[in-house]
Amino acid sequence: MPITPHIVVQGAGRAAAFYGNAFGAEELDRIPVPDGRLMSVRLRIGGGLLHLADEFPEMGVLAPPSIGGTAVVLALDVADAEAVIAQAVTAGAEVCQPLADTFWGERHGQLEDPFGHRWNVGQHLRDVPHAEVVAAAAIAFAAGPAS
């Protein structure tokens, strides 16, 4: 069963344009409500779907700036992480974690979009046995958080 993220933004129309410029998202449809807000904008990014909605505070539907951040990170598996990150930065995203080769076998970086959502961008480099990933994670996190 597929999973489709629904994310809340301040300005769903602007967000749809941003995701088109940043990640090549294709807008499939949108559902406006009488006051002009968008209940849904359905996008296709690669082989997946993403739904956007404007804030509806009267229903408790709030975007990251209204709640002080986000607890969710969206992930993109791409063929060229450097190109995707460069395109997203040109469109207005900020780099949170610069691209680096990781112990789990990806070239990986993280972005924050102008709407407060975080995106991991990963490019598969090599298969790493699970036991090696677990051992490397233990070493990487042994010292605690980086300061």
Stretch-by-stretch model annotation:
Residues V9-G13:
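Short acidic-aromatic low-complexity motifs
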Residues M1-H6, A17-E112, Q123-S147:
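Vicinal oxygen chelate
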